Regions:
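N-terminal intrinsically disordered, cationic/polar leader segments
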Residues: 1-30, 36-124
Length: 124
């Protein structure tokens, strides 16, 4: 469990937390809080598009995804989620890196994913 302070980017902060605690792979189990504005990406037949949900005070309803670093490279998995604007209208998509700043705070729950070798697995 971690708390992001005001003006910290959601994606970049979660990645930094994982690095700080030596997590090579982690799963976001949930988050609550608010964003100044939300910037989400979504798929269309003509390719990805972005939308901006204006705040301040865009509420986070759910965040999910996997954080993983392979061979020292960046995280190829964007976080996804659901947010509500100040009128209660709901939006979903991938959070755009560097564009989703915490308004007051965001509390987020991460679980480290530790790979188990086949011979170490416990039979069912």
């Amino acid at each position: 469990m971690a708390r992001l302070k005001p003006n910290q980017d959601l994606t970049e902060s979660v990645e930094a937390l994982c690095r700080q605690h030596g997590m090579k792979t982690a799963i976001v189990r949930g988050a609550i809080g608010s964003l100044i504005d939300a910037h989400l990406q979504y798929a269309t037949p003509n390719g990805p598009r972005e939308m901006e949900i204006n705040g301040p005070g865009v509420e986070i309803l759910n965040v999910f995804g996997e954080i993983g670093f392979s061979d020292g490279q960046g995280n190829p998995h964007p976080l996804q989620g659901v947010v509500a604007d100040t009128d209660g209208k709901i939006f979903a998509g991938r959070f755009v890196r560097g564009a989703n700043l915490s308004f007051i705070t965001i509390e987020i729950t991460l679980q480290e994913w530790v790979a188990v070798k086949q011979q170490e697995a416990v039979p069912a």
